[in-house]
Amino acid sequence: MVFSNNDEGRINKKLPKELLLRIFSFLDIVTLCRCAQISKAWNILALDGSNWQRIDLFNFQTDVEGRVVENISKRCGGFLRKLSLRGCIGVGDSSLKTFAQNCRNIEHLNLNGCTKITDSTCYSLSRFCSKLKHLDLTSCVSITNSSLKGISEGCRNLEYLNLSWCDQITKDGIEALVRGCRGLKALLLRGCTQLEDEALKHIQNYCHELVSLNLQSCSRITDEGVVQICRGCHRLQALCLSGCSNLTDASLTALGLNCPRLQILEAARCSHLTDAGFTLLARNCHELEKMDLEECILITDSTLIQLSIHCPKLQALSLSHCELITDDGILHLSNSTCGHERLRVLELDNCLLITDVALEHLENCRGLERLELYDCQQVTRAGIKRMRAQLPHVKVHAYFAPVTPPTAVTGSGQRLCRCCVIL
């Protein structure tokens, strides 16, 4: 479209409303609000509900009160598909009831840290928001099993649910949830400390589409529960068991035999796991990309050898506090396909047997981006310097204890702390 110099009309008169709305749809909230102040015509365009399909209020969390959410819901109505109220501690049940009534097409709702909300909010969502697919209730500590019963009855399209740190949830709530929401693909239950193996049995029975499960710090879970999950959820790709300190190699065996698509395994602080379990896992789960084995204190270089042979896609590996790992294990890892092509992050802090020789081996890992070496007492500054000469892009985090100075005979000058070194 070409305009002559004599044209007096402004852009809002030259372009059709549909095209102007399309242009405005690319603007963020702040820019839309600024545009709304330009003129009456732009105010109408900027505040058109079709431009407010996705709203994230995290950056304004301290200023967001209930009335803000209510006004947004009235403005957006059925247009709104995605809303994040993460950290908006001033928002409560009453406002979210109004929101649910006005925004019945909402699909993605983040209420992480909205500590004022109770079961009442979940009842409202259940009643009015049947299209909800993604719901984050992290740290909504007043949520109980009643919420899960309501969600299961009214939000049957739910695919993602985060209940982390909702520590009133028990197996009864999980049973009610999964009976109604059988299409769940991701369920995050970090810090739900009352959950026991029976809860996992219910998940196994109904959630055959499950891809991601987080059980971090669910300390009552045992091998029996993990075995149940593995038998029913063969599509599992991401599993977090960190802090489930009762687990043994039986859990790894179940994963290896039943979950060949596994890509992410977090098993930090599972101190009973051994090389035998990880050997079977590695030989069957060739898609593994990320593993957190921090404080798996019984594993040795044998685990690294098996991962090197069978897991060519490995990108991130944490071996922090695995004190039996040596330079030889790092040699096998560095010479493997994953070492040459995929490895990006390696955490070796508090691996006391690691020396500068391991750093020489890691020079083969051309894609390495981050290396953690805190409290590796046999690693030297010189060794790190030599490695970084070959891998200049890698970020190395290391700690060197300061040399104890001799006792001053006279006077005492101010000293600088030079303990922590980020290289």
From Swiss-Prot:
Membrane topology: Lipid-anchor
GO cellular component, one term: membrane
Location of this chain's protein in the cell: Membrane
Cross-link (Glycyl lysine isopeptide (Lys-Gly) (interchain with G-Cter in ubiquitin)): 201
Residue window of motif CAAX motif: 420-423
Lipidation (S-geranylgeranyl cysteine): 420
Modified residues (Phosphothreonine): 404
Record's comment on post-translational modification: Phosphorylated by GSK-beta (GSK3B), promoting recognition by FBXO3, leading to its ubiquitination by the SCF(FBXO3) complex.
Pathway stated in the Swiss-Prot or TrEMBL entry: Protein modification; protein ubiquitination
Molecular-function annotations in GO: calmodulin binding; ubiquitin-like ligase-substrate adaptor activity
Repeat (LRR) residue spans along the chain: 61-87, 88-113, 114-139, 140-165, 166-191, 192-217, 218-243, 244-269, 270-295, 296-321, 322-350, 351-375, 376-401
Residue ranges occupied by any F-box domain in the UniProt entry: 9-55
Top-rank lineage group of the source organism: Eukaryota
UniProt keyword list: Calcium, Calmodulin-binding, Isopeptide bond, Leucine-rich repeat, Lipoprotein, Membrane, Phosphoprotein, Prenylation, Repeat, Ubl conjugation, Ubl conjugation pathway
Stretches of the chain forming a coiled coil according to its record: none
Gene Ontology terms: biological process: negative regulation of NLRP3 inflammasome complex assembly; protein ubiquitination; regulation of autophagy; regulation of inflammatory response; regulation of phosphatidylinositol 3-kinase/protein kinase B signal transduction; SCF-dependent proteasomal ubiquitin-dependent protein catabolic process
Ranges for region Interaction with Calmodulin: 80-90
Subunit and interaction comment: Part of the SCF (SKP1-CUL1-F-box) E3 ubiquitin-protein ligase complex SCF(FBXL2) composed of CUL1, SKP1, RBX1 and FBXL2. Interacts with calmodulin; may antagonize substrate ubiquitination by SCF(FBXL2). May interact with PIK3R1. Interacts with PTPN13.
Physiological role: Calcium-activated substrate recognition component of the SCF (SKP1-cullin-F-box protein) E3 ubiquitin-protein ligase complex, SCF(FBXL2), which mediates the ubiquitination and subsequent proteasomal degradation of target proteins. Unlike many F-box proteins, FBXL2 does not seem to target phosphodegron within its substrates but rather calmodulin-binding motifs and is thereby antagonized by calmodulin. This is the case for the cyclins CCND2 and CCND3 which polyubiquitination and subsequent degradation are inhibited by calmodulin.
Domains as described in the record: The CAAX motif is a signal for the geranylgeranylation of FBXL2 and is required for its association with cell membranes and the recruitment of substrates to the active SCF(FBXL2) complex.
Protein name: F-box/LRR-repeat protein 2
